[in-house]
């Protein structure tokens, strides 16, 4: 029997990796071994950063809410506590959006929180 070297399968595998490495800088999109390493790292970064993105956005929202709350004479923690006492359930994403795009509505929420805090 003739020896089968698996050329078609190997070429397909290498081609798939090099296609995934398209756009990478330098040898990382040309050489199979370095491309494979970079693609593996890319999968790791993508997995890690999908989780990191959630933390980053929460941080951003809290920063925006804090800035708007301080313009209304409250700290972030006081505002959140006041809203909880007033039984106003608005998540941080919506609060941050109000702080940026609708200052009047945010001020109304801040006033409701102040009233419950007794300020």
From Swiss-Prot:
Transmembrane segments: none annotated. The keyword Nucleus does not apply. GO terms for biological process: ribosomal large subunit assembly; translation. Keywords: Ribonucleoprotein, Ribosomal protein, RNA-binding, rRNA-binding. GO terms for cellular component: ribonucleoprotein complex; ribosome. It holds the Pfam family Ribosomal_L20. The keyword Secreted does not apply. GO terms for molecular function: rRNA binding; structural constituent of ribosome. NCBIfam families: rplT_bact (TIGR01032). Belongs to the bacterial ribosomal protein bL20 family. Binds directly to 23S ribosomal RNA and is necessary for the in vitro assembly process of the 50S ribosomal subunit. It is not involved in the protein synthesizing functions of that subunit. HAMAP family: Ribosomal_bL20 (MF_00382). This is Large ribosomal subunit protein bL20. The lineage of its organism: Bacteria, Bacillati, Bacillota, Bacilli, Lactobacillales.
